[in-house]
Every structure is written in structure tokens, then in C-alpha cells.
């Protein structure tokens, strides 16, 4: 991830993800460090780099906790943003699941990448359902 960051790949992908992050997390102020950590986590997950997504995810939750402190809310109670981030993160949209391909190759699969298509479909569906659920839940909570 550090190489991708220095090469400008993460920055370029982050700009493309900004509209999605603003849509899913409208209450996070522009320029807040939580946005950067959330975006980095999403990019790492999409690229199938779960090991690289974990630190960014932990940093995102910490930044969201700090945001709750700034708002004067109890940090020990999960905010809507924390719940949304957790659901989007768990749904884990992935284009290429490097780990599954590696395991299939290691255990002698004739075509270890055959799972990629089904994996993309499954993670796209789970992410869409998760995002829709969060938007509906958050809209009802604000009424």
C-alpha cells in the first residue's frame, strides 16, 4: 500500500471514491481524516488486499470516535457513521480476491482464478444491499 501511495495510485483512486464516501457518510466534514482512512480501507478491500485494509479500517474507526468526541457524543456508543462503515466493510466489495486465488492455487486447483466472476457478483450484491440498508436506516433515524 505504501508503494501505491507513493506512486499516486491511492490518491487517484481516492478522488474517484470521494463521491461515494460523501454519499454514504454525509455527516463527516469535508477534509476530516476519517474520509481518508475510509477511502484507503475501501480501496484495499476492492483490490483484495484485506491485510492492508485492516490498519486503515482501525484508523477510520478511531477517527470516527474522535469525531463523536468533537460532537460531544458518547464515544462508546457506535454512531451511524461507524455502523455504516462496519456494514460496508463487512460486505467487502472485491474485484480480485488474492487470498482465495492463492489458496486455490496452493491446493492444486486447475483454474484458481475461476472463482473471480462469482466473487465479484457476490460482493457487488452484498455491498449494494448493505449500502441500501444503511441509507434507509440512517434516513429513518434522522426523522
Sequence positions of predicted segments:
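Juxtamembrane and boundary regions of transmembrane helices in multi-pass small-molecule transporters
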Residues: 114-143
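Mid-bilayer segments of alpha-helical transmembrane spans in multi-pass integral membrane proteins
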Residues: 42, 50-51, 89-95, 127-128
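Membrane-embedded alpha-helical segments and adjacent helix-loop junctions characteristic
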Residues: 1-65
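Intrinsically disordered, low-complexity non-transmembrane regions of multi-pass membrane transporters
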Residues: 19-26, 30, 66-77, 139-143
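Membrane-interfacial segments
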Residues: 4, 8-9, 68, 107, ...
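Hydrophobic transmembrane alpha-helices that form the pore/transport pathway of multi-pass ion
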Residues: 46-86, 105-107
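Transmembrane alpha-helical segments of integral membrane proteins
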Residues: 95-106
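The feature identifies polytopic integral membrane transport proteins across all domains of life
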Residues: 34-45, 78-88, 110-117
Amino acid at each position: 500500500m505504501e508503494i501505491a501511495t507513493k506512486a499516486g495510485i491511492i490518491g487517484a483512486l481516492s478522488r474517484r471514491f470521494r463521491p461515494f464516501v460523501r454519499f454514504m457518510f454525509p455527516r463527516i466534514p469535508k477534509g476530516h481524516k476519517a474520509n481518508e482512512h475510509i477511502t484507503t480501507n475501501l480501496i484495499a478491500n476492492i483490490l483484495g488486499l484485506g491485510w492492508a485494509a485492516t490498519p486503515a479500517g482501525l484508523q477510520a474507526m478511531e477517527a470516527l470516535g474522535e469525531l463523536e468526541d468533537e460532537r460531544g457524543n458518547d464515544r462508546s456508543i457506535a454512531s451511524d457513521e461507524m455502523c455504516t462503515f462496519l456494514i460496508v466493510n463487512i460486505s467487502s466489495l472485491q474485484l480480485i480476491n488474492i487470498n482465495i486465488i492463492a489458496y486455490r492455487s496452493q491446493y492444486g486447483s486447475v483454474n484458481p482464478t475461476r472463482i473471480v466472476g462469482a466473487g465479484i457478483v457476490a460482493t457487488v450484491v452484498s455491498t449494494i444491499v448493505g449500502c441500501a440498508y444503511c441509507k434507509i436506516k440512517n434516513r429513518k433515524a434522522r426523522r
